[in-house]
Amino acid sequence: MQPYLQLASLRLATTIPLAPRLYDANLLAASGAAMASSMAYIALLCAALAAVVALLRWAYRWSHPRSNGRLPPGSLGLPVIGETLQFFAPNPTCDLSPFVKERIKRYGSIFKTSVVGRPVVVSADPEMNYYVFQQEGKLFESWYPDTFTEIFGRDNVGSLHGFMYKYLKTLVLRLYGQENLKSVLLAETDAACRGSLASWASQPSVELKEGISTMIFDLTAKKLIGYDPSKPSQVNLRKNFGAFICGLISFPLNIPGTAYHECMEGRKNAMKVLRGMMKERMAEPERPCEDFFDHVIQELRREKPLLTETIALDLMFVLLFASFETTALALTIGVKLLTENPKVVDALREEHEAIIRNRKDPNSGVTWAEYKSMTFTSQVIMEIVRLANIVPGIFRKALQDVEIKGYTIPAGWGIMVCPPAVHLNPEIYEDPLAFNPWRWQGKPEITGGTKHFMAFGGGLRFCVGTDLSKVLMATFIHSLVTKYSWRTVKGGNIVRTPGLSFPDGFHIQLFPKN
């Protein structure tokens, strides 16, 4: 028994100390794990802190950009987004957008902002605007935000400079210059306006914006590319441009369901049609030039062509868009303004009925001499485009640091010349929101951009289609006021986002005059 007790005592003596040792080991292991966890937490906290500091520094640098001089006042908004959301906010009036108006009131006529990720100086100052246009190619160059470049193509005429831009401008003037207007386009526009108005008068009503857009598109697309809507390969071209236009000036979010995505899809499909037409033309034997596309194909076939296929396609796309959309919008808002101002319609009828009375054949078309005699009509057109403000901004980019009006515009920054801010300035135009064509009475015809009138641009890039646009508007007004009366059926409300649109259309009914 004794040995057993001794053995038991020995076992007890050797086993009892094991428990504290195991406890200590577990404690050490737990402490190590806790320490490792704490270290990981501290590391994570430091990383988060570093990220926050980096983010704050980035945000500070965004809102306080480096400059070699005094920047214009204003805010660049949130990083990357900037003030893009405010810029695209809808405005249901003809007045200056709240985005520009509020900032002019707060900062003055020159201020900085950020739109679609780029710092931009906005100018509502006539002197600065004129200076920017006059210094193109020296201190500034034509520029549009990346999203606009994606829409119109990276090789579109607005993105080209120097010799290539001048060459393309000369090419376009073959079609839209005064000689071709006198000899060909005046008669064709007059016939198109007569035919369309007669067709609309036979219908219960017409959605005017869509009707005018189709009329001008059919006319100009035929002159540009020999457009034939009866051909299966071309039947959807007008529809594709319609989709493109719906999202043209919208928030640049390219995901399905957004207006911008619809715009990009419209461009892609329109370019597919144009590319197919180009391949067909290139495969055909050489022929005399019948339309503008033939001139382009002729250039592409040269041994050392100045054009590339990409530049040619982007050029055709931009010309098709510019040829019909802006004029269609101006004419639509013009008819709306005439509807609201019957005294102006009476004065127009007086001028145009006098023209008809002086004709040998009352049913003959408008001649060039008659067109040039439409003095009051010219005043009406000037007033329409002043109030329409189809183009909310004209963009340029500083090629170097530019000192102007006590401010420094850093190299690489964008400049947005704001025509509406000038056209609606009460210090320049008395009662600027009033439709008053007589304000232009006795003033010389404007043939280029001025400090106080930029509806057709300014400087070297004054719109080459200005004369065609004026001819279209004048011949349309001539047939409208001499052959018809009309009434509004529904719609007519406008929205600027910031581009002009008629969200519920503008439906009118035409009544032929006896």
Curated annotation (Swiss-Prot):
Its EC number is 1.14.-.-. One of its GO terms (biological process) is brassinosteroid biosynthetic process. Its main location: membrane. One of its GO terms (molecular function) is iron ion binding. Gene3D superfamilies: Cytochrome P450. Expressed in roots and coleoptiles, but not in leaves. Heme binds at C463. Keywords: Cytoplasmic vesicle, Heme, Iron, Membrane, Metal-binding, Monooxygenase, Oxidoreductase, Transmembrane, Transmembrane helix. Its cofactor is heme. It is found in: Cytoplasmic vesicle membrane. The keyword Nucleotide-binding does not apply. Disulfide bonds: none annotated. SUPFAM superfamilies: Cytochrome P450. Induction: Transiently induced by auxin and light in dark-grown coleoptiles. One of its GO terms (cellular component) is cytoplasmic vesicle membrane. Not induced by auxin in the Yin-Yang mutant, characterized by an elevated growth response of the coleoptile to auxin. Belongs to the cytochrome P450 family. This is Cytochrome P450 87A3. The lineage of its organism: Eukaryota, Viridiplantae, Streptophyta, Embryophyta, Tracheophyta. The gene is CYP87A3.
